[in-house]
Amino acid sequence: MSTIDLIILGSLYQSPKSAYDLQKQIESRNLSRWIKIGSFTVYKKVVQYENKGYVVSETVKNGNMPEKTMYTITAKGKEIFNEMMVQFSLAETRVFLDFNAVIVNMALLDESSADACIANIKNSIQNTKMQIAEQLPTHKDIPLFGRTILEQQFLLLETLEKWEENFEKELAKEREEK
């Protein structure tokens, strides 16, 4: 089971939802920035959960609206959710950054190309930090458990900015010594 499973089951633990409603909630909480999940994945997951007995489905129709399938978490699903909460809270903290693959291979590039990649990484860190900084004031009214993730990401990006500045200085120093 993955963090995606934990997020989807957690959402269904709060209240029954359709796959579409789950996807919209993931988007509205900006969770798609932190986990890779698409609408087809959500649909595929709820079908898997139903086959495993974690959720039950019910097709409902409201007025003139088209039918939709609502998913409700079962006792077994709640048990799995609770087990995953413990499992993930005990897991080793790992930080995966796609740009680390660029850093590892940077020695294979000429200086100009390497500098361009560094500038791209720097811009990406700064842009993401700015986006989160803009969101923080507007999210003061959301519950602590959601707001704290934004704050965590902002602090991590500040640390990455410092790391990137150090990396540039060390690289410049290494180039001077050659």
Put a short name on every predicted segment.
Residues 125-136, 157, 164:
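Non-transmembrane amphipathic alpha-helical segments
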Residues 132-151:
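Acidic interhelical loop/turn segments
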Residues 14, 44, 120, 152-155, ...:
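DHp/HisKA dimerization-phosphoacceptor four-helix bundle of two-component histidine kinases
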Residues 146-178:
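Long, low-complexity, charge-rich intrinsically disordered regions
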Residues 106, 135-140, 171, 175:
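Secondary-structure edge/capping motif, primarily at the C-terminal ends of alpha-helices
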Residues 82-127:
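Amphipathic alpha-helical dimerization/coiled-coil segments
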Residues 1-92:
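Basic helix-turn-helix/winged-helix DNA-binding cores
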